From Swiss-Prot:
GO terms for molecular function: rRNA binding; structural constituent of ribosome. InterPro entries: NA-bd_OB-fold (IPR012340), Ribosomal_uS17 (IPR000266), Ribosomal_uS17_bact/chlr (IPR019984), Ribosomal_uS17_CS (IPR019979). This is Small ribosomal subunit protein uS17. Keywords: Ribonucleoprotein, Ribosomal protein, RNA-binding, rRNA-binding. Belongs to the universal ribosomal protein uS17 family. Transmembrane segments: none annotated. It comes from the Bacteria. GO terms for biological process: translation. GO terms for cellular component: cytosolic small ribosomal subunit. It comes from Sulfurimonas denitrificans (strain ATCC 33889 / DSM 1251) (Thiomicrospira denitrificans (strain ATCC 33889 / DSM 1251)). Part of the 30S ribosomal subunit. One of the primary rRNA binding proteins, it binds specifically to the 5'-end of 16S ribosomal RNA.
């Protein structure tokens, strides 16, 4: 069994049925100015039970491609919105 990549991010949009868009933040050192800057990337996550809401913090795990741009599925909700 292979080790699947996990990403942690915040839900920013519910993109249709069983799909949520999350934004993942990473911090990198700027090559010239040596300052830590934030970089963001959006991923589509498969939500089988339609349980996610905008603002939730989640952990997603890599899986086989479910569509052209969707290759992650929901693993757990870390912090839910009330």
């Amino acid at each position: 069994m292979t080790h699947k990549r996990e990403i942690q991010g915040n839900v920013v949009k519910i993109s249709g049925d069983k799909t949520a868009s999350i934004v993942v933040e990473r911090r990198v050192m700027h090559p010239r100015y040596h300052k830590v800057v934030k970089r963001f990337k959006k991923y589509l996550v498969h939500d089988e039970r339609n349980e996610l809401k905008v603002g939730d913090e989640i952990v997603a795990i890599e899986c086989r491609p479910l569509s052209k741009t969707k290759s992650y599925r929901l693993k757990s909700v870390v912090v839910g919105v009330k």
